[in-house]
Amino acid sequence: MGNANIDESDLKILEILKKNARTPYTLIAKELKVSEAAIRKRIEKLIRQGIIKRFTIEYELENEIRAIVMVQSTPQIPTPEISKKIAKIPGVEVVYETTGDYDILVIVRGTNITSINRTIDEIRSIQGVVGTNSTIILRTWF
């Protein structure tokens, strides 16, 4: 999945789609001053290369709570193995493997503190997890 074939136009397309994954190809083409067919081919190439993994939405419900959970793992169990188990837990939105004091960063979503705690407890119960540090997200800015 090398990025050797990525040029400025591809980066601009990615930037536009990151802001709004539903942007019509015609609008992207107009902004880049190319044909819609050229945009379609470039996006298909980005998907084929694994650069665009999926088209999704980010949402925030009024009564929903989100938290960042930083996870420390033991070296005896590979971090990807732990990360995959965490990703399967209900309430887990996204899992990142990281460097530093914590090996994994998890974004958790729930309807209340009890559901957030339940998800964190489930993360802690995974073999190889030796510690967590959690922070509630107050506001999100895009």
From Swiss-Prot:
CDD domains: HTH_ARSR (cd00090). Gene3D superfamilies: 3.30.70.920, Winged helix-like DNA-binding domain superfamily/Winged helix DNA-binding domain. It is found in: Cytoplasm. Pfam families: AsnC_trans_reg, HTH_24. GO terms for molecular function: sequence-specific DNA binding. Its main location: cytoplasm. PROSITE patterns: HTH_ASNC_2. Residues 25-44 bind DNA. Residues 6-69 form the HTH asnC-type domain. Induction: Constitutively expressed. Pathway: Amino-acid biosynthesis; L-lysine biosynthesis via AAA pathway [regulation]. InterPro entries: ArsR-like_HTH, AsnC-type_HTH_dom, Dimeric_a/b-barrel, HTH-Lysine_Regulator, HTH-Siroheme_Decarb, Tscrpt_reg_AsnC-like, Tscrpt_reg_AsnC/Lrp_C, WH-like_DNA-bd_sf. Keywords: Activator, Cytoplasm, DNA-binding, Transcription, Transcription regulation. It comes from the Archaea. Signal peptide: none annotated. GO terms for cellular component: cytoplasm. GO terms for biological process: lysine biosynthetic process via aminoadipic acid. Homotetramer. In the absence or at low concentrations of lysine, activates the biosynthesis of this amino acid via the alpha-aminoadipate (AAA) pathway. NCBIfam families: trans_reg_LysM. This is HTH-type transcriptional regulator LysM. The gene is lysM.
